[in-house]
């Protein structure tokens, strides 16, 4: 593809796909976010929700977390040597 066509193609994609999607998202998400902001008007409610969210996020483990912990255990065993 010739280089001068690339910016034109990107601009076309941006105007045809991304801008309408952003408009739709704004149209549907803004009222929801405003309603949520009204419900979370009190500082206590915001702190409680943030605490719950942080707890949930702290409980999530990546798929590699189990593998990494197994490797860590094996490395620890090698460093400590045979157990009596």
Curated annotation (Swiss-Prot):
GO cellular component, one term: plasma membrane
Segments for region (Disordered): 62-84
Motif (AxLyCxL): 48-57
Residue spans, topological domain Cytoplasmic: 1-4
Location(s), subcellular: Cell membrane
GO biological process entries: myoblast fusion; myoblast fusion involved in skeletal muscle regeneration; plasma membrane fusion; skeletal muscle organ development; skeletal muscle tissue regeneration
Protein name as it appears in the record: Protein myomixer
The organism of origin for this protein: Homo sapiens (Human)
Source lineage: Eukaryota, Metazoa, Chordata, Craniata, Vertebrata
Name of the gene: MYMX
